[in-house]
Design a protein with these regions (language model features):
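Σ70-family region 2.3-2.4 aromatic/basic alpha-helix that recognizes the −10 promoter
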Residues: 24, 28-32, 45, 49-89, ...
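Helix-turn-helix DNA-binding helix
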Residues: 48, 122, 133-134
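Short amphipathic alpha-helical boundary/capping segments
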Residues: 90-101, 124, 129, 144
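Flexible coil/turn residues that form the inter-helical turn or adjacent wing/linker of helix-turn-helix
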Residues: 24, 41, 115-116
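A short, charge-rich alpha-helical start-of-domain segment used by transcription regulators
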Residues: 1-35, 46
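Short amphipathic alpha helix immediately N-terminal
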Residues: 100-121
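C-terminal flanking helix
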Residues: 24, 28, 98, 105-106, ...
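DNA-recognition helix of helix-turn-helix
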Residues: 126-163, 171-173
């Protein structure tokens, strides 16, 4: 009996290792998008790795193998929920396009755009109404499309031409 349980545990571990070998890279990229850390050079994304390891540990604890549903969905769900719980503790990302977004906006945008999770599934996953997910996603996309406010000379400014004229002063030549 104990031999059968040991064999089952080894099989479970091998199935999980195969899953991580196949999906680990994409899940790590998702974690780096959520934390806003750069994905290069390797080792520059310590928070994303910690987030992924914690999510994978929980996934392994709930692991039923490929027969218990989609293991990628299970891991992605755990990654998203763990980030949502810890989102306030994550530092704001520095220097990337997602640094202007709140943790909730990053989470919704990553799930909807990068992971291509439907609006209803995203809402169910996060425990939010569908309208709220739609509004958060639209706000995040608008924030990414808007020119940066901290743009220096030669870069776009969020104030546009009117802001440039105002900075030069009234009556100044364009």
């Amino acid at each position: 009996m104990a031999e059968r349980a040991t064999h089952r545990d080894r099989l479970r571990a091998l199935e999980f290792e195969a899953f991580v070998a196949g999906a680990g890279g994409r899940l790590l990229h998702t974690a780096t998008l959520l934390t806003g850390e750069p994905s290069h050079p390797p080792g520059a994304y310590a928070r994303a790795e910690r987030l992924l390891h914690a999510a994978l540990a929980r996934t392994y604890a709930d692991w039923d193998g490929p027969h218990g549903g989609d293991p990628y969905d299970l891991a992605r769900r755990e990654l998203a929920l763990r980030f949502a719980r810890e989102g306030r503790r994550h530092q704001r990302p520095r220097g990337g396009p997602l640094d202007r977004l709140t943790p909730v906006e990053r989470l919704v945008l990553v799930l909807r755009v990068y992971e291509e999770v439907g609006e209803e599934r995203t809402a169910a996953l996060l425990g939010l109404p569908g309208d709220r997910v739609r509004a958060v996603c639209a706000r995040a996309v608008a924030a990414l499309r808007a020119p940066r406010r901290d743009a220096g000379p030669g870069r776009a400014s969020s104030h546009g031409r009117a802001g440039q004229r105002a900075a030069r002063g009234p009556g100044a030549a364009p």
